[in-house]
């Protein structure tokens, strides 16, 4: 029985999951919005929210903890300098997950995960897809 076991395995080993979540967190912090499957989005949300809380603490130990998880100094500096200051007055709830239909190849449920008050000029993959879809709708 699997009672009391939190988290999803996502058909990956523990090391693969850890690396995947680190890469997804770095991409989400860099682009402020990513498109992924719904289960991955639900799993990455608490990881990134905890990283933002570390960024809000702002001390050296918090920065080292963030670097140990993300392993990209440029992303950590953006987290601590830009994102943490943006959410200085907000107590949690930094991310939103919006369902985005189903992937054509395998019908997997897709989702857009983004920062709540994100920079509108930080164009993520979902923005480019949305703009292309709007242009096709206008042309049709």
Curated annotation (Swiss-Prot):
It comes from Rhizobium johnstonii (strain DSM 114642 / LMG 32736 / 3841). NCBIfam families: L17. GO terms for biological process: translation. Pfam families: Ribosomal_L17. This is Large ribosomal subunit protein bL17. One of its GO terms (molecular function) is structural constituent of ribosome. InterPro entries: Ribosomal_bL17, Ribosomal_bL17_CS, Ribosomal_bL17_sf. One of its GO terms (cellular component) is cytosolic large ribosomal subunit. The gene is rplQ. It comes from the Bacteria. Belongs to the bacterial ribosomal protein bL17 family.
